[in-house]
Amino acid sequence: MGDSITIIGAGPAGLCCALWLVEAGHRVTVLEKQTGLPEDMRASTFHPATLDLLDGSGVTKTLLGQGTRVRRWQYLRHGHDERIVFDLAAIADSTGHPYRLQVEQFRLTSAIVQRLRDHPGFRLLRGARLAGLEGGRDTVRYRYEQHGESIEDQAQWLIAADGGRSTVRKILGLSFEGSVFPRTSITLVLDHRFQDDAPGLLGVNYVWTDDGHYSLMRVRDLWRFSFSPEDEENPVEAQDAKAAQARLQAVFPRDRPYRIAQLNHYTLHQRCLERFRLGRILFCGDSAHLNSPAGGMGMNSGIHDAACLVEHLLPVLAGKAGEGHLDRYDRRRRTIALDEVQRLSARNYRRHRETDPERRSVIWADLAATAADRERHRDFLLDSSMLRSRQREREID
């Protein structure tokens, strides 16, 4: 086995790093502060570019058996017979997976853990909370707490994939500049046949109401209903179950309450580290950058970070490149985070939450013209599927 790498965080980005490093013959230890893998639906969209990346390890095949393939998705105006449909067949020549896969992110992390659990090069420490960290010239020393004990260890390289509230980032005192979007996002998971209430629904739907918005996405027999508080709503009160029922009844009225399986709310940030590499400490995923979830790019971009990080780390581990080779990982993925992921997700955030009638008319006309024009349709989907960001990443030296 090769050099040892420690990864902080067992989310999608961290475990994808672990998967690809172990497959390449390296020893990996993953520290996860929680005792189990979370099973919420914070992210549920796998874009074509991500499915292509996961194909080689067999993970995509596993996920396909657990999710819903969405080949066509749409914008709708609730209560009006108006829709704009985008068809991923337009980019079938650029991907092996011309569809979005709607499946919970924990299906990915569970699949990777199952794949690696008996591998001698993989060690997952649950309930292990990072408590100290010191980067050196040849190693990274760290301390973690588990089962009431304080344990010291070291690795040749440490990957911080521990999320938006990264402990690694805080221990190192790194600035995480950016801003908070003005509206929270509230997500409900329901076991209800919305397709019977609105027969024109597709697997992914972005919907304007007269004075607000919601999105509705299908994951097998479940639906994920997301919205933001209205302007006049108290944002805290909007997050309780009573307010959620009121929002559901406003768009899909019925004579009894909905059964809500999950209710989650998220504060939305747009932030980015100044550098994704600090010596032998590397950052990826939400620990490195945050963006609006509009368009489903957050988890996907974290997985893309992981692929790019491993691609640059492997030749360094093999002695075929110097440590400076990893600076290109920083340049590539930081540029993509700022110029592609944050730009597109912020545009989606504004588009979905626009309420001014005149500005809505302009947006709607532009989307309709885009969908109707073959080249613009394809161009739009290359961006939204994240295939273009992967292409642009490879053009950055």
Model-derived features: positions:
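Glycine-rich FAD pyrophosphate-binding loop
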Residues: V22-R42
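Extreme N-terminal leader/targeting segments of oxidoreductases
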Residues: M1-I5, E23-A24
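C-terminal helical "tail/cap" subdomain of flavin- and related membrane-associated enzymes
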Residues: M1, S228, E274, H312-D397
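Conserved mid-domain beta->alpha element of the FAD-binding
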Residues: G9-L19, E23, I112, A160, ...
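A conserved short coil-to-beta-strand element within the FAD-binding core of flavoproteins
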Residues: R126-V140
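Conserved FAD-binding catalytic core of PHBH/FMO-like flavoproteins
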Residues: Q114, V140, E149, W157, ...
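Conserved hydrophobic helix-helix packing surfaces used for dimerization/oligomerization
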Residues: I5-I7, V28, I281
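Active-site-adjacent segment of FAD-dependent monooxygenases/related oxidoreductases
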Residues: R42, H47-R115, V341
